[in-house]
Amino acid sequence: INLASLSEAHGEGVRPLHGHFAKLSCIAPLERGASGLQVFTQDWRVTRKIEADLRKLEQEYIIEVRGETTPQALERLARGATRNDRELPKAKASWQNETHLRLALKNPQPGQISELCAYLRLEVRGMRRIRLGGVSMGKLPLGQWRYLASTERF
């Protein structure tokens, strides 16, 4: 994160200062192999708040997959399903297009998104987090960042 990668979409009156880039910590890290929305802060209060609420915050992913599944299997995810005698987390799933699955769930643990896709008999080719709670990436280009708008809340 640096001044050069600040998105042009940012325009809300926060003037970037060099001190804004010191001692940043990443909260709510991405699943291994995923890209997309990450949250960085210097404020310990923000860190504490998000870490305390992380279990309740819904996270939304767009997953590039290969394969086909049934609408009934997608509906089963919303009620909860089991795979290999393990309970899978409840998740809202829908097709964005033929190769991209939209998945929304709370507090995904490492490997759970891949496991949900395996339950659906889909092969994961890539995944991107697009939303964390009430904060969405919107049309933010890859590799760019922006400040949190004053109207946004996790």
Residue ranges and their predicted role:
Residues 1-154:
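Basic, flexible Lys/Arg- and Gly-enriched helix-loop patches that mediate nucleic-acid binding at interfaces
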